Amino acid sequence: VTLKNVSANTVPEMKFPDAPHSLKMACGENPKRVYSSRAPSTRMGNVAGYRNARIGAENYKEQLESDPSHRDIRNETLAGVLDGEILVHNHCYRADEMATMINIGEEFGYKISTFHHGVEAYKIADLLADEGICAALWADWWGFKHEAYDMTIANIAIVDQAREGTG
């Protein structure tokens, strides 16, 4: 849900009219840390988890066709992503992880709307431009953890120039 930063008593009062729903997902160190006791604590383990979750959502969509009364909250949101009803925002720092998430989106038929943080977005600026993916980037904050080391102060300019075709 997209919210307006306004004084209100309830979240529905803050909702931006007619804005699409969105889902923010993380890649990299955060899911490795959070899910380490439930899955392999590696980037490959993360990708396996992403793919398994999307396969589960595809199966859920098939079940809904035969039994519309069947509800599975765990898969409902990702089914909305696969149907294009929910926009995807991805929290990624590294270029290889952004490229991997783009590949997963292509595999399952959805598009990533925005990459957040993206300290290595400059490395794949042309790919982001070609795919029409927005990048919400920090101007001057990096190096606070290992996956956020390899940035340049020109990150935003490089990504913007690729988008404009002037890079």
Protein language model features and the residues they cover:
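Polyanionic/metal-chelating signatures
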Residues: 1-114
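Active-site environment of divalent metal-dependent phosphoester hydrolases
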Residues: 95-99, 118-125
